[in-house]
C-alpha cells in the first residue's frame, strides 16, 4: 500500500538569493538553518523521503536531525522511516520494474542523459548542500558532483551497448544464445563520505540495465541523496524506479535487515565499514543475494630511495588529506626508505602546514571537519597510541583551536608495526611515516593487511 495524500510533503516556496546575513545565520547553532536561501534552486532541499514518486513523511511521523559538522548548525529534520516504510519502498520498486525493464535501451539512456544534464546545471547548489551536511571544502564537493555525474553519463551510453552472445554449441542441431537481462530490484546502502558519487555509481548501472532501486543513504548526509533524486524525477525517471529511504542510526539497523532479508531484492550494493559489511552479508545469505561490498581500506604509500621527493610529497598530500583523510582508498601507511626518510618527512610536514582548516564554505579552506565525535575520537586514539609507543609527532596531533570536530593535519615519524595506526583504518588526516631498508621487506609489509 502506497502513501496516502496526508503523508505527502509540502512544496518549498521560492526564496530569495543568498545574502551575507543568510550565510551568517547558517552558523547560528541555536536555530534550524534556512538552506533554501543559499540555493539558486531551492526545490533541491528536501526533508521528506521518496517512495513511488511521492515525497512522504515517515509512517510513524518521526524525523531525525541533520547537523552541519563544521558549525553544529541544525540543517534539517528529515523523515525517519521505519521497516514498514522500507517494505513499501521495495514494493514500489518491484511494481515499477516490469515497465522500466521493458523500455528500450535508447529510452532509458535518454532519460538518464537528461538526469546527467540536470545534475550539471545544479552542480553549484548540490556542492553547497554537500558541504553543509558533510563538511568537505566547497571545491572538493563540486569536484564530487562532477565525478558523480560522470557515472550517469557513462552508463547512459552503456545502456545502449548491453549485448548478448551466440557461443558455439556442443550440439550440431542446437544454437546457444546468451541474453543479458535486468536482475530485478536492487538496493544501495551508501556512505556519508561521498554522498553523491557513491549513489550515482550504484544507481546508474542498475538503471541502465533496466533495474529499479531502493537507496538507503547514510543518516549524516541524506540531503544530497534527496536532491539528486529530485533531479531524477525532473528528468523523467518513472515513479518507483528510484526510491530513497531515509532513517537515523537506530532505524537504519532494522531497515538494513529488511532490505537484506527481502526475497524481492535480488542485488545489494554497500559501501562502508567491514564490520557492517559482515552483518549485511550474513543477513543476505538466506536469500542468496548477489552482493557488491566495498569495505574498509588501509592503502600503503611507498617511497623508494630513488624517488622524486617533491613528486612523492605532492602525491602524498592528495592521497592522504582529501576529504580530511575520510576516504577508504586514501594512503594510510607511508613506507619511506631510510635514505630519503628525513627529507621526505621534512617536506611533507612543510606541505601539511600549509593546509587551511575551516568551514568548507569559506574561501581558501582546504580541509573541513571530521564527520562527528566518534570519528575524531578514533583519530585521537590512534595518534595517542602511536606516540605512547615511540612515534615522533612532527606536526599537528591535536584538535584544532576551531573546536568541534576539526583535527589538525598530522605527520608522525618513527612509526612501527606495533602501533594501531599501522593495522587499523584511521579515517582521518594523519600521515604515519614508517622507515624501511629492504625493498622485498617493504612489499611484504605493504601487503600485510587484513583489508587486502
Mark where each language-model region is.
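Terminal low-complexity tails and localization/encapsulation signals of metabolic enzymes
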Residues: 1-78, 110, 114, 164-189, ...
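Residue-level signal for inorganic ion chemistry
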Residues: 72, 108, 130, 152, ...
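Conserved glycine-rich beta-strand-loop-beta hairpin in the small C-terminal domain of fold type I
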Residues: 365, 404-405, 424-430, 449-452
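Rossmann-like NAD(P) dinucleotide-binding subdomain of oxidoreductase/dehydrogenase enzymes
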Residues: 164-311, 436
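A structural signal for short, well-ordered beta-strand elements
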Residues: 65, 79, 101-102, 134, ...
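ALDH superfamily catalytic-core signature
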Residues: 234, 251, 275-416, 438-447
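Structural signal for hydrophobic packing residues in well-ordered secondary-structure cores
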Residues: 97, 101, 116-123, 127, ...
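Glycine-rich loop-to-alpha-helix module at the N-terminal edge of alpha/beta enzyme cores
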Residues: 73-163, 173
